[in-house]
Amino acid sequence: MSVRRRISEADGAAAFAQVRQVFDTVLSGEKPLISAENRTEIEQVFARLPRGVRATAVRYALDELATLAPGNSVEVRVPPYGVTQCIAGPRHTRGTPPSVVETSGFIWCALAAGALVWDDASASGLLTASGERSNLSRYFPLF
């Protein structure tokens, strides 16, 4: 079963290119990844992007994950921008799904761009992941 994308490839790629530029501009030199020391600065630059660009980039990355890992056993929440389900396994029909991942739009885009590593984000509390299938580290970076 194919996943129906909510964001067109052209719109999503254009929005994500703007997000990637934030990471590429700030993350140069010897520290290629987001760290506790530079996260606030990068997040402020990300927040200055138009809301529509941020929303489109997040939704595009959610669509990409759902395409790479189709299924319904993990729900990925990135409030207020979007949600998707992915990973094959037990399907839920009501209530909380068996596995849930939740994070901010900034962290989601950083993971998708490869500017942040899943294990670092999880260990530092920048995302929450519960359930046996909630470790999505093998899918990142998405782009």
How does the language model describe each region?
Residues M1-F143:
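Feature captures hydrophobic
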